[in-house]
Amino acid sequence: MTVAESTCALVSTQPSIGKPTGGIATYSPAYTIVPTYECFNRCTYCNFRTDPGESSWMSLSAAEDIFKRLQNEQVCEILILSGEVHPNSPKRQVWFQRIYDLCKLALTLGFLPHTNAGPLSFAEMQELKSVNVSMGLMLEQLTPKLLETVHRHAPSKLPELRLQQLEWAGELQIPFTTGLLLGIGETNDDCWETLEAISKLHQRYHHIQEVILQPHSPGNQQTFNAPAFNPHQLPEVIAKARQILPSDITIQIPPNLVKDERWLLACVEAGARDLGGIGPKDEVNPDYPHLQAEELREILQPAGWDLMPRLPVYPQFDGWLSGELQASVRRWRELVIGNW
């Protein structure tokens, strides 16, 4: 029985929202930079990748133009989201250097970088720590059976490889975001086991900021022939995740993948108190435009929820950052708290 099937029996056809409890939901004012869409993985649900040579790489000059324009807008996070170059490829070092240079440029121009570029070597993670306030990598699902289906042609989706990234992030004291992709063939137990693995690592290193619960949402590029994960089933999954995960890990959902306002509120009520990075475009789900902050406030405020901006690093992790990064974070905290 899949998560979709087993959860369906637990969730009614209407969201269970009683008297609003109210509180704070957060989001990160963000802009996504894609160094390259090129990727050696071929996940069948992907709507992001291109084949090598099909698209140009982001140049530093093009990125600088974007960053300078963004200096006049309320954007604090630069998400460096990249397709993956094979670790043994002769282009790997050039690829990594481009990512590092983009992070450094963003930092120099006043932004807070967060990188998600697939599995990295320990040395690569260590180097990127100096120019990122946080980093991330989705676990998606740890069950090895997906290596026979949606991840059949995706070498970097080996469960042990991705878990190793979370462990290295803990050893390096890198504030980290991870998450699950729901509705790609996993069972209910698979889902809970992935959450339990995250919980176990966090209890050892105390480094996980957020866990994203992302419903599979079909797009125009994918070859995976399966329906969307029903967002009406998300509240129960969120509630279970809240039971499994330590209380200092924030649960995040992408609001553009939960179109029904009532169900979005139900997700927040169930324990998803962060709505992720909000920017002009969702690069991973390009067929699903982001809801902007004002639209989200119109949904949340009548139910008693205040939507507040946050930085891509949570305050309890500031001490893990270098002096330079701490100074940038301190400036942003004063700005966000004082004016936004």
Swiss-Prot record:
Protein name (record): 7,8-didemethyl-8-hydroxy-5-deazariboflavin synthase
Subunit structure: Consists of two subunits, CofG and CofH.
Keywords on record: 4Fe-4S, Iron, Iron-sulfur, Lyase, Metal-binding, S-adenosyl-L-methionine
Function: Catalyzes the radical-mediated synthesis of 7,8-didemethyl-8-hydroxy-5-deazariboflavin from 5-amino-5-(4-hydroxybenzyl)-6-(D-ribitylimino)-5,6-dihydrouracil.
Family designation: Belongs to the radical SAM superfamily. CofG family.
One function term, GO molecular function aspect: transferase activity, transferring alkyl or aryl (other than methyl) groups
Residues annotated as binding [4Fe-4S] cluster: 39, 43, 46
Pathway(s) it belongs to: Cofactor biosynthesis; coenzyme F0 biosynthesis
Top EC category: lyase
Organism: Trichormus variabilis (strain ATCC 29413 / PCC 7937)
Reactions that this protein is recorded to catalyse: 5-amino-5-(4-hydroxybenzyl)-6-(D-ribitylimino)-5,6-dihydrouracil + S-adenosyl-L-methionine = 7,8-didemethyl-8-hydroxy-5-deazariboflavin + 5'-deoxyadenosine + L-methionine + NH4(+) + H(+)
Domain of life: Bacteria
Record-linked PROSITE patterns: RADICAL_SAM (PS51918)
Named cofactor requirement(s): [4Fe-4S] cluster
Domain Radical SAM core: 25-256
EC number: 4.3.1.32
Pfam families: Radical_SAM
Note on cofactor: Binds 1 [4Fe-4S] cluster. The cluster is coordinated with 3 cysteines and an exchangeable S-adenosyl-L-methionine.
